Amino acid sequence: MTDPKETINIENVVASTGIGQELDLQSVAMDLEGADYDPEQFPGLVYRTQDPKSAALIFRSGKIVCTGAKSTDDVHESLRIVFDKLRELSIKVEDDPEIVVQNIVTSADLGRQLNLNAIAIGLGLENIEYEPEQFPGLVYRLDDPEVVALLFGSGKLVITGGKEPKDAEHAVDKITSRLEELGLLD
Amino acid sequence: MTNQRTTRDGSHGTESVPTQRSRESTDEDHGCPECNGDLVTDEDRGETTCGECGLVVEEDGIDHGPEWRAFNAQEQDEKSRVGAPTTNMMHDKGLSTNIGWQDKDAYGNTLSGRQRRKMQRLRKWNERFRTRNSKERNLKQALGEIERMASAFGLPDSVRETASVIYRRALGEDLLPGRSIEGVATSALYAAARQANTPRSLDEVASVSRVDRGEIARTYRYVARELSLEVAPTDPASYVPRFCSDLELSGDVERRARDLLAAAADAGITSGKSPVGLAAASVYAAALLTNERVTQNEVSTVANVSEVTIRNRYHEILDAGGEPGVEA
């Protein structure tokens, strides 16, 4: 049996940062090649980097959110590209603006089918949310680490809300040990 | 004096009626404590016994009915020990006074014009007094809404009562601000119906509610979490009898559908699948197996799920039920 932790794969990393000055998005959009800015659709300017693949949302307040990256390194890398691009437009950006990771979305696979009904009862109806009429997954909110796990009948799971990659590993550990305790992982 | 005592006893009796009822039903669920046989209640002797082994489970039961026999309406009123039961389904629990609309006195004579105008004024102020603050007006509207939707579904009083209590708790714990009265009332009814094992699907609920499905689902999740209602996931089998009777299918089909659902659950193919879809597909599959013709279209109309869902599920259900190779 493979360790479910080995199947952990980071799907998305969201980080935020700021350049500490207000921007005129209209003129930035004109000068920055490949930028999407449609204030009727979305108030931010969207700039997509290709390598690493990610999307940076640049707001009028000078705050930047980077999403879609596959690792924390990629987030830093793509934000560095964004900063360089802004500097090319002679917008002052300090050397190393603080980058805060807000959310990491991870997927994993327990490797076998799950009986969500039994798990719902086993984990305690007060701790989980399972409404097959509304959503096929079982929502399990953990306190430590503070993440939300979605368990699916196929045995796959999605862990979201973590601030660092370690959180997902802890969560998978916790979930597998809880399910083994309950005898729900044959 | 005696009369007063009996009245008090009587009102005590009414209060215990719901608990008594619920205990009886759990007795039925559990059966005989010795052999798990079915319990039989002998009302003449006031005894509850086991039909299998004869164990007396309860004796000297209390008769909650009115005193003695009554031969006409007047005697019935005189001998009744109880008034109307208090109910959570009314905003004042049914405890307030209503001034009749007929403008007649106790003898049935029409009132004079002067008295009529007085009653009109009293009626107005009584109505204003009954719903003094916004909370009571809120309750009045919500409970009316619950009543309306429950009637549309033909849900029994016990479910309405539960829904009303859930709504009252939501109101008491300040869950209303930011949500609509109709939304919370609808989700209270949805939760109550599920707790009573007579679930109505979200689509059905949305069809009689004044709010849309998305808002009901959101409000329901919020209310269920905040009040820790702990509603277990719906058992698909609880939809089967209703679908079968709507489609005018025999008891045979119903039994077959239940068996198929049990087999599907054992095979572990029901996780994360919508219970409504599973129920509809099992009814369709069971009808095929018993050679009673229904079309996927008919089932989909009754169950409010798409034909595609039925097609996808019923193959899986047939495979799990060990009935492969059956084709429509």
From Swiss-Prot, chain A:
Pfam families assigned: TBP (PF00352)
GO terms of molecular function: DNA binding; DNA-binding transcription factor activity; general transcription initiation factor activity
Sequence repeat boundaries on the chain: 10-86, 101-179
GO biological process terms held by the UniProt record: DNA-templated transcription initiation
PROSITE patterns: TFIID
Task of the protein: General factor that plays a role in the activation of archaeal genes transcribed by RNA polymerase. Binds specifically to the TATA box promoter element which lies close to the position of transcription initiation.
NCBIfam families attached to this UniProt entry: PRK00394.1-2, PRK00394.1-5, PRK00394.2-2
Sequence similarity: Belongs to the TBP family.
Xref: PANTHER family: TATA-BOX BINDING PROTEIN
Name this protein carries in UniProt: TATA-box-binding protein E
Taxonomic lineage: Archaea, Methanobacteriati, Methanobacteriota, Stenosarchaea group, Halobacteria
Curated annotation (Swiss-Prot), chain B:
Positions with a binding annotation for Zn(2+): C32, C35, C50, C53
Organism: Halobacterium salinarum (strain ATCC 700922 / JCM 11081 / NRC-1) (Halobacterium halobium)
Pfam families per the UniProt record, alphabetical: TFIIB, Zn_Ribbon_TF
Intrachain disulfide bonds: none
Entry protein name: Transcription initiation factor IIB 4
Start and end residues of each stretch annotated as Disordered: 1-47
Top-level taxonomic group: Archaea
The keyword Ribosomal protein belongs to this UniProt entry's keyword annotation: no
Zn-finger segments (TFIIB-type): 28-58
GO terms for cellular component: transcription preinitiation complex
Presence of the UniProt keyword Chaperone in the record: no
Function: Stabilizes TBP binding to an archaeal box-A promoter. Also responsible for recruiting RNA polymerase II to the pre-initiation complex (DNA-TBP-TFIIB).
GO MF annotation terms: DNA-binding transcription factor activity; TBP-class protein binding; zinc ion binding
Sequence repeat ranges, renumbered to this chain: 144-227, 238-319
Gene name of the record: tfbD
Entries under PROSITE patterns matching the protein: TFIIB, ZF_TFIIB
Keywords carried by this UniProt record: Metal-binding, Repeat, Transcription, Transcription regulation, Zinc, Zinc-finger
